[in-house]
Amino acid sequence: MEIRKRYFLSKKDVKKIKKELEVFFENVDEIIPKKGNVEIAITDDFEIILVDKEPIAFKKDDKVIPTLKLLLKSLPDKNLVVVDIGAIKFLINGADVMAPGIVDADENIKEEDVVFVVDENHKKPICVGIALMNGKEMKEADKGKAIKNLHYVGDKIWNFKG
């Protein structure tokens, strides 16, 4: 992944990012410390937000979306979708999440929400995506795409070196 542009963010821009991350995390000041160096790295596909050279989020369609590396450190307790073990091999190759593979989902999820997909055994994040149906539908549907996969273990964002 080639970086086209990279720059440090102003305090005002950092505040905006913190506000967007507060939707998912209560510990935003730990995620982005006052003395942390916050940068944006612009690639052909994404704008990656770095704190002390560690990718914590990326921007897609004007949404700030947490990276899996951040989720491994601090997993929110909302917007979670649990998938069965059989789905993992497809998700880590970039496949969208299909409804039959979903074991459980936060019923407060609405269509177009950012969601975090975890495995049923270890509850470790596997991918981050956008909900294509609400949480209740995800649990009940037996066919169709439920989540558009945006970022998964082993992709360009996962392998990004700050």
Swiss-Prot record:
Pfam assignment, any one: DUF1947
Biological process terms in GO annotation: formation of translation preinitiation complex
Disulphide-bonded residues: none
Residues covered by the PUA domain: 78-154
SUPFAM superfamilies assigned to the protein according to its UniProt record, in alphabetical order: PUA domain-like
InterPro entries reported for this sequence: CHP03684 (IPR022430), DUF1947 (IPR015266), MCT-1/Tma20 (IPR016437), PUA (IPR002478), PUA-like_sf (IPR015947), Uncharacterised_CHP00451 (IPR004521)
Single GO MF annotation: RNA binding
Cross-referenced NCBIfam families: arCOG00985, PRK14560.1-4, unchar_dom_2
PANTHER family cross-referenced by the UniProt entry: MALIGNANT T-CELL-AMPLIFIED SEQUENCE 1, MCT-1 PROTEIN
Protein name: Uncharacterized protein MJ1432
Species the sequence originates in: Methanocaldococcus jannaschii (strain ATCC 43067 / DSM 2661 / JAL-1 / JCM 10045 / NBRC 100440) (Methanococcus jannaschii)
